[in-house]
Regions:
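Carbohydrate-active catalytic/glycan-binding domains of CAZyme proteins
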Residues: 1-214
Length: 214
């Protein structure tokens, strides 16, 4: 988890109108990566167009063209999830700059082959009172519980929240588990839960450094 090498790119270009030019504040936001059915899946949003997904059987090889799961403005940070029983889901957040919402997570049932989102979504958590700027959800299943790791409070001074429930549709309970504390590393923001080969658990997240990026 310490030393990384770039081996490939999921997208050579973004095949959407206008992206042959520089587009500040647009483009690919907060992708998530998952392994299912012998394939790697990368799901991402473009905040003005919708939610897309790509897949490959070989991360060093060719990735599929981005497939649009749903056209929508202001839907961001999607995370697909395949349940142990074969049910597929997708959770996403909202961009306040496009939707006027910044504190809710929405859940969709998804076709198992990730070809489409099914039906209308449902809001599974509303952090209006306790979790402002709730975003970046990542979904996991462990020991009979479903977990959603999601940062709140904004990238500069926020914290990491974990939601858990016995079923994906809820009800979800929330606990704030990680704060900046006295360190100089702001955040912690939009991280992922990783379990090592020996069962040890790690949390990997980004740090916002303004002009230097994240």
């Amino acid at each position: 988890l310490v030393n990384w090498t770039i081996i490939n790119h999921v997208l050579d270009e973004l095949p959407l109108p206008g992206y042959d030019r520089y587009q500040p504040g647009k483009g690919v936001w907060a992708p998530s990566i998952r392994w299912h059915d012998g394939k790697l899946w990368v799901c991402f949003s473009t905040p003005d167009e919708g939610i897309f997904i790509c897949h490959t059987e070989d991360p060093w090889g060719k990735w599929s063209a981005p497939h649009c799961l749903r056209q929508a403005r202001g839907w961001i940070d999607p995370c697909p999830f395949w349940d142990d029983n074969g049910q597929a889901w997708l959770v996403h957040a909202f961009a306040h700059s496009r939707s006027g919402i910044k504190h809710k997570l929405q859940l969709f049932a998804m076709a198992p082959d990730a070809s489409e989102l099914l039906g209308e979504g449902q809001i599974i958590y509303d952090g209006c009172c306790d979790l402002p700027t709730l975003e970046g959800p990542k979904v996991y299943q462990r020991a009979g519980w479903y977990y959603i790791f999601a940062p709140a409070g904004g990238v500069e001074n926020g914290w990491q929240t974990v939601l858990r429930a016995r079923q994906m549709t809820g009800p979800w309970e929330a606990k704030n588990v990680l704060f900046q504390g006295n360190t100089s590393i702001n955040g912690p923001h939009q991280g992922g839960w990783v379990e090592g080969e020996k069962g040890e658990c790690w949390f990997v997240h980004f740090q916002d450094l303004h002009l230097y990026g994240r």
